[in-house]
Amino acid sequence: MDKNLEYEPIRGAHILMIVNPVSGRISGEHTADKLEAWLKENGAAVDRFETTETENGSGYTAKLAENDYARVVVLGGDGTLNAVLNGMLHRALRTPITYLPAGTTNDFAQTLGIQKHLLDPYKSFTETEDRLIDAGKFGDGYFSYVASFGLFTKCSYATPRTMKRLLGHFAYVLEGMKDLHALDATPLAVTADGKFF
């Protein structure tokens, strides 16, 4: 990153940074160190928290209600972003999010055309604009771009991290193939825009 580059909109901003250090194929922690240093060099105050086996990022969003954060920075994959969004929506918080996709497939980022600026993360601040996205509710949880159920739902959660690191997206395909024998229909009721289907 260009250490001389100054980005005025973050000067004086208080930023909550949520990092999944084991996300995807690259070292999220190394990228987080670079980004945190750049934010601080440009005058931001940064509170950084890392996800663990017992804290997926959702719980850290409680800090948004306790502090005056200008922005949440999420460095991780689809699961990390989903956890943060759920934590925020359950608390009715609308703090802007900067998402740095660092997962195995980054479906959310690809769907919205978010570039993977991990080698130069400051571009996520300097070359993008905030935009509103829709969120839906499925049972007690929220979703931002996809809600799934049925046969292949569990494969994204059941796929071992070691397989994802070795095989990337293909690891999900292999995991999903294990359940092909259980193919069956699922009854469904949907309420959208006040209409029941």
Residue map of PLM features:
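Short glycine/serine/threonine-rich phosphate/pyrophosphate-binding segments
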Residues: 79-84, 107
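Catalytic core of DAGKc-family lipid kinases
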Residues: 41-42, 49-51, 90-197
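ATP/NTP phosphate-donor binding region
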Residues: 1-72, 82, 87
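A residue-level signal for conserved active-site and pocket-lining positions in enzyme catalytic cores
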Residues: 20, 78, 153-155
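Short hydrophobic/aromatic-rich motifs at helix boundaries and adjacent loops
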Residues: 6-9, 30-34, 57, 77, ...
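Glycine-rich beta-strand-to-loop/alpha-helix junction loops that act as flexible
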Residues: 21, 75-77, 100-102
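Short beta->alpha junction loops/turns
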Residues: 24, 53-54, 77-78, 114, ...
